[in-house]
Amino acid sequence: MTAKIFIDGEHGTTGLQIRTRLAGRRDIELLSIPETERRNAAMREDLLNNADISILCLPDDASKEAVSMVAGNNNVRIIDTSTAYRVHQDWAYGFAEMDRDQGEKVRSARFVANPGCYPTGAIGLIRPLRASGILPDGYPVSVNAVSGYTGGGKQMIAQMEDQSRDDAISANNFLYGLTLKHKHVPEMTIHGQLDRAPLFAPSVGRFPQGMIVQVPLFAADLAEGTTIETIHAALTAHYAGQDIVSVVPLAESKGISRIDAEELAGKDTMKLFVFGTPGGEHINLVALLDNLGKGASGAAVQNMELMLSA
C-alpha cells in the first residue's frame, strides 16, 4: 500500500530538502499544500489528518499547533523537526544509532522528535563514552562547532548570499549563542546522558552545507587508564554494524592534517574521529556531517523509513 506523507512546512529549508529526497518515489504519495495556502489552518489540518506520516518542518509554536490538530487521530504519526519535543518523555528521539534499540523505538513510535544538527554530532560522540563509563559524572564537557549557513534557514541564507540587503552578513565566520544558552543545550544534556549541562560554543561559516562538532577532553580527568585507543574502541563498538555513522580508524586519522567541514555536504552519513597529542594527555573528538543531511532532512527521511517498516 502506498504511504501518504505530508510535509508541513515543505517550502522552508528543511522541508524542501525532504521533498527533494522523496520526489519521484513510487512507494509514497506526497500530499502537498500550495505555498500561498501554507497559513490556511483548515487545509493544513485536513492534510495532517489524512497522512500516514506528517513531517513537521516548522518553528516550535507552529509544531505544537500542528500536533494539537491530530490529537484525536491515532492513525497519523508525526516526525517533528523543531526543538519543541526533543526532550519530551513521550516522544521517541530520532537518532536511530544512539543506542542499539533506538531504531526500534523510532520504528514503533507514533511521535518522533528529529534531532538537532549540533546535538547529533555532540551526542554521537558523548553518549558512547557515558555508556562505557569513560566520561565520569561531573565532567565539564565543552562542545565547539561550526555549521554551514543553511542551518539558519531562509533568512540567514539570504543574509549570507545577498550582500545588497540592509541586514546582510559580511563575515566569513562568526560566533553566536554568546550567552551560552543555545536551544540545543538541553537536548545535548538529556540525550548525552550528562549530569551537567555542556558549555556549547556554536559558529557559522560562509559555506552552505556541512558541519564540524568538536568535544575536547583531558585524559587525566576521564576514567582511570583512559587512552586515545580506549576511547576509539568504545566508539567503534558502539557503532559496530551501522551504515550511516562510522568511526574513522586511528591509523587513518593519524594521517589527517585538516578536516573539511564540507566533506559530507549532500550526504546523510556522519563520520567520527579521535585525535590527540602524542602522549595522549589531550584528546579531541570530532564529528563530521551535513547540517541538512544527518543533521536534519536526511535523519527525517531515515526516521520515516523506519516508521514505514513497522
UniProtKB/Swiss-Prot annotation:
Main location: cytoplasm
GO terms assigned for molecular function: N-acetyl-gamma-glutamyl-phosphate reductase activity; NAD binding
Pathway: Amino-acid biosynthesis; L-arginine biosynthesis; N(2)-acetyl-L-ornithine from L-glutamate: step 3/4
UniProt cross-references to Pfam families, sorted A to Z: Semialdhyde_dh, Semialdhyde_dhC_1
Residues at the active site: 117
Lineage of origin: Bacteria, Pseudomonadati, Pseudomonadota, Alphaproteobacteria, Hyphomicrobiales
Stated name of the protein: N-acetyl-gamma-glutamyl-phosphate reductase
Organism, scientific name: Agrobacterium fabrum (strain C58 / ATCC 33970)
CC annotations in GO: cytoplasm
Cited CDD domains: AGPR_2_C, AGPR_2_N
